[in-house]
Amino acid sequence: MRNISDLPNDLLVKILSLIPIKVAASTSLLSKRWGSVWKLIPTLDYDGTYSAAALEFFGKFHTLVALRFMKLTIEDVHSTTCFRSVKNLSLLDVKFSSDKTVERLLSCFPILETLVVHRWGADNVKTFAICVPSLQSLNIRYTVGGYHNPKTDHGFVINAPSLKHLDIVDHFSGFCSLVNMPEQLDAEIHLRHIDSEKLLESLTSSKKLSLCLKPQTGSYPGGDFDQLVCLELCVMCSLDWLNLILRRSPKLRSLKLYQSRERNWSCRNSKHVRTKWEQPNSVPECLLVSLETVKWILYKGTQEEKDVVKYLLKNGNFIKTMSIRFSSVVTLEERIHIPMEFEFMGRINSSRCQLSFSKL
């Protein structure tokens, strides 16, 4: 043990990071030299049941920058608990004693920048409130086995004025409220049950959006997406959102439409699928002055999809490239005929539009 004690702190910390935290903490009994070395561990994983005293204990890690709680229960949080150096926090299948416990826990991280929350339905929390002024990246997964009905009284309230990236996949919530959102935010939103109109009102300043939403249930009362440059949109459930966002996005340059098997959580097995395409009453400004790139992933060749592509080719004055990746349901004959039809449309509008086709 004397030879190990002669090693520099940096190397000892790396060694201690590879063993269970309880074992690492027990090394403090070996000698004075080991008394505080374990507190320098930068990343901590822990599972079990947390009392308020246990949380306060982990606040003694002076250089801890990443903390992951997984499959555990947090009973309470002392007001004096503080993780002053932690920038990355993961809450994975964590149960809490109440909604307030969530709020008290997150208030212990004054410089938190990245938060990952994975919920699995039975965590004793109805309103999961995330109020973190320093937060820059938020990743939320709220899923349950199968396709359960939503809990209308379960959901999220997010108040993060410094947020730069938001990624939500939510199969379960009845609501999601975004308050005090920053002017610039990239967001990836996949929602099964939540009415999306109000949520989108908080994202109108985004430059990049990736959306998979249930069909519109009412009129959209929000403003325009004046800063939106890149849009990814799942069209498996509804083409309504494409119409609306094209009309409201005067600076849009890149459009990606998809029905990817990996990314259609929000509308798989949906009872509300609606794929009817209705042309806008007037040509959206982005088609006339800014849209340059169009991609379609898992294109099936339905009449509605053909109508969309033809409309974009006819009215997209500045579209430089359009790439279409066929779904496996498209026959060989269709894969030959469709490019010929669209290439003719492209030549009518502009010789600068380069069309490409491929099989998934």
Curated annotation (Swiss-Prot):
Residue ranges annotated for the FBD domain, each copy included: 276-326
Kelch repeat coordinates: 140-186, 235-285
PANTHER family reported in the protein's UniProt record: EMB|CAB62440.1-RELATED, F-BOX/RNI SUPERFAMILY PROTEIN-RELATED
InterPro entries: F-box-like_dom_sf (IPR036047), F-box_AtFBL13-like (IPR053781), F-box_dom (IPR001810), FBD (IPR006566), FBL13/AtMIF1-like (IPR050232), LRR_dom_sf (IPR032675), LRR_FXL15/At3g58940/PEG3-like (IPR055411)
Keyword line: Kelch repeat, Repeat
Name this polypeptide is given: Putative FBD-associated F-box protein At5g56430
Ranges where the F-box domain occurs: 1-53
UniProt superkingdom: Eukaryota
